[in-house]
């Protein structure tokens, strides 16, 4: 279980301190598929980086299974079972997919096991196992290979920052199928996705809406999703693939624009 307790994060812009995250608290229980959504610039991606250890909070605590990990590095958190998938996966010239899966797992992975991980994410193993992770791969292929590395790692908490970014509609549909399979087979772990996409929100167990650096609302999907879809309360973000963000009223009825803080997600 992951807990964020009164998390605060500021950045310095010239002589000013800008609040990005303001006193945010929430819990991600075990065996849950959680999606964080909200307007562009609301602080969603910053929260993902804070959880992964890429950024350190200015206040508050991050607790994993009862242990305070606030000061732990990204490497320490990875060893403890937190994985982080970036919006744009890195290409590794000269490294084959099999090697990448073994590096991710931190141990010797058999070819048979590697093929199984690739098959789970919808890739034909024999076509990819010996391919280089380079520019010859499409964005959708890279995303699925990155998810395969998360499966190989066997983490307690898998964090995906806008996995739909930079991929086409066909790849996005395949990606949804992969996440549905991960949700259905989830055991002794949790999945956290930062996303604007309605199709991803539809498969969540819990939804957390973040706006202007704060929790606007959170709860079970069936309680939160109806207020986000098909109306101007679509959080500037809950949109079909290829759609445009909307302006959003917050839970108190005030308007939340679809873009804030210069594009910070």
Task: Locate each region found by the language model.
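Walker B catalytic motif
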Residues: 162-163, 170
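ABC ATPase NBD coupling module
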Residues: 68-83
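Conserved structural motif at the start of ABC-family nucleotide-binding domains
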Residues: 2, 19-21
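Helix-to-loop junction immediately C-terminal to a conserved catalytic motif
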Residues: 52
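Q-loop/switch helix immediately C-terminal to the Walker
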Residues: 88, 94-110
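The feature captures the beta-strand-to-loop junction immediately N-terminal to the Walker
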Residues: 37-39
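Conserved beta-strand-loop-alpha-helix hinge in the C-terminal portion
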Residues: 214-239
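Conserved ABC transporter NBD signature motif
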Residues: 60-67, 113
């Amino acid at each position: 279980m992951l807990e964020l307790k009164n998390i605060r994060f500021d950045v310095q812009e010239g002589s000013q301190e800008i609040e990005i995250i303001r006193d945010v608290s929430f819990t991600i229980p075990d065996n849950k598929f959680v999606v964080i959504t909200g307007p562009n610039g609301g602080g969603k991606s910053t929260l993902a980086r804070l959880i992964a250890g890429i950024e350190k909070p200015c206040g508050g605590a991050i607790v994993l299974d009862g242990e305070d990990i606030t000061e732990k590095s990204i490497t320490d958190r990875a060893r403890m079972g937190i994985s982080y998938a970036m919006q744009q996966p890195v290409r590794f010239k000269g490294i084959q997919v099999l090697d990448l899966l073994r590096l991710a797992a931190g141990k010797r992975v058999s070819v048979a096991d590697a093929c199984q991980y690739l098959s789970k994410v919808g890739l034909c193993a024999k076509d990819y196992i010996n391919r280089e992770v380079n520019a010859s791969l499409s964005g959708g292929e890279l995303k699925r290979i990155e998810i395969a590395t998360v499966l190989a790692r066997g983490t307690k908490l898998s964090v995906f920052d806008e996995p739909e970014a930079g991929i086409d509609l066909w790849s996005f549909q395949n990606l949804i199928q992969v996440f549905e399979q991960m949700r259905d087979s989830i055991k002794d772990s949790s999945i956290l996705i930062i996303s604007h996409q309605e199709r991803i929100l539809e498969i969540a167990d819990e939804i957390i809406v973040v706006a202007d650096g704060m929790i606007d609302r959170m709860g079970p999907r069936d309680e939160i999703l109806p207020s986000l879809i098909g109306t101007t309360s679509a959080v500037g973000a809950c949109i079909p693939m290829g759609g445009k963000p909307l302006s959003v009223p917050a839970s108190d009825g005030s308007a939340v624009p679809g873009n804030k803080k210069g594009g910070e997600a």
